[in-house]
Design a protein with these regions (language model features):
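Bergerat-fold GHKL ATPase/HATPase_c domain
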Residues: 1-39, 137-167
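N-terminal entry segment of metal-dependent catalytic domains or homologous docking segments
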Residues: 129-180, 185-195, 267-269, 273
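Conserved beta-strand-loop-beta-strand hairpin that lines the nucleotide-binding pocket
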Residues: 1-5, 45-139, 168-174, 229-231, ...
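C-terminal catalytic subdomain
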Residues: 4-9, 13, 210-220, 279-339
Length: 339
């Protein structure tokens, strides 16, 4: 789950920095890494207050081949910016200790940004522990790049949505789950589904959901979907129950997947996999019903080519609605996966 920090006033920057550094401390980041993270959060938060007038910082831990990192997304609907100009040191928040967006890029282990004028900006920064990177063993290159965001309903601390992705042998298994309602009982249902997925994530999607259905009987139930993405066969195998949306989208068109009616843990119809071709250059997007389904990435030129985390943040910014938890995951086959 991402921490959500509204950035409407300079006083909110310090709280975002404090909570982000606490997160890094729980991950046992070293002092240098915590310092880099503090500067990044300060710069991005200050930029939102000064130049966007409003906006949000989304902060979460993220697992990777080299260990865990902290992901920071700065999201706004402001006037947009000239990224090439603003990435020069000192151009944006030049009176802070880090000297602007250029410093954010330099301090980050991963960095990306996208902006339209008008239309707003999303900046992505990931900060990894130097110690974790140093001790990590060489890992095979992951075949899929992804970005995922999960945020609780307004006023809630716990989130009834969750997601997971497991990559093995050129395949990825992806889960999105939405516990009924929101709050602690919804979170309990979602965690039961996540445990069923984690026990054997590479099983056929219908088998994963059947196992989750059986293990969730004591909960209030959930909507959930599982997709198995195959980079070599260029195929997506999908099964879902309830109100989870999934779509393959590219510059040429979209293809949506249908879920079975019902609720895992309560009552659900026959769970059956469907396999469809994965067109080259298409993204796979799956989300809970906390995100509206009437989105079209093609309406924003350049967005389809962005880092999946930036696309996920853009969708959350523009299409979240109502008082519900929301989760979205965006997956792209890495360069060279589609031979």
């Amino acid at each position: 789950m991402h921490q959500v920090h509204d950035m409407n006033d300079a006083s909110q920057v310090g709280e975002a920095r404090r909570r982000s550094v606490l997160m890094a401390g729980r991950l046992e980041f070293d002092e240098d890494t915590c310092g880099r993270l503090a500067l990044v959060v300060t710069e991005l938060g200050t930029n939102l207050v000064r130049h966007a007038g409003n906006g949000r910082l989304l902060v979460a831990a993220r697992a990777g081949a080299a260990g865990e990192s902290v992901e920071v997304l700065a999201v706004d609907s402001g006037p947009g910016m000239d990224l090439e100009h603003c990435l020069r040191d000192g151009v944006t928040s030049s009176t802070t200790a880090g000297t602007g967006l250029g410093a954010v890029r330099r301090l980050s282990d991963e960095f990306a940004a996208f902006s339209t004028a008008p239309g707003g900006t999303v900046v992505l920064a990931r900060i990894a522990s130097r110690r974790a990177v140093a001790r990590a063993r060489p890992q095979p290159a992951e075949r899929f790049a992804y970005g995922a965001i999960s945020v609780p309903a307004v006023g809630e601390i716990q989130c009834g949505d969750d997601w997971a992705i497991v990559q093995r042998d050129g395949r990825a298994s992806v889960l999105v789950v939405d516990g009924l309602g929101h709050g602690p009982d919804a979170e309990t249902a979602a965690q039961a589904c996540l445990q069923a997925f984690s026990s054997a994530p590479c099983d056929a999607p219908c088998d994963v959901l059947a196992r989750a259905h059986a293990q969730m009987r004591a909960t209030r139930g959930a909507a959930a979907a599982v997709a198995r993405l195959d980079a070599d066969a260029r195929e997506v195998t999908f099964c879902g129950a309830g109100n989870i949306a999934a779509r393959l989208t590219s510059g040429l068109g979209d293809r949506s997947f249908l879920c079975q009616h019902g609720t895992l843990g309560l009552q659900v119809g026959r769970l059956q996999d469907v396999a469809v071709p994965w067109p080259e250059h298409a993204l796979f997007v799956m989300h809970s019903d906390g995100l509206g389904g009437r989105w079209d990435l093609r309406k924003t030129p350049g967005l389809l080519q962005c880092d999946p985390a930036i696309i996920a943040a853009w969708l959350i910014r523009d299409h979240i609605g109502g008082r519900d938890d929301a989760t979205v995951i965006v997956v792209r086959a890495s360069a060279g996966s589609h031979a």
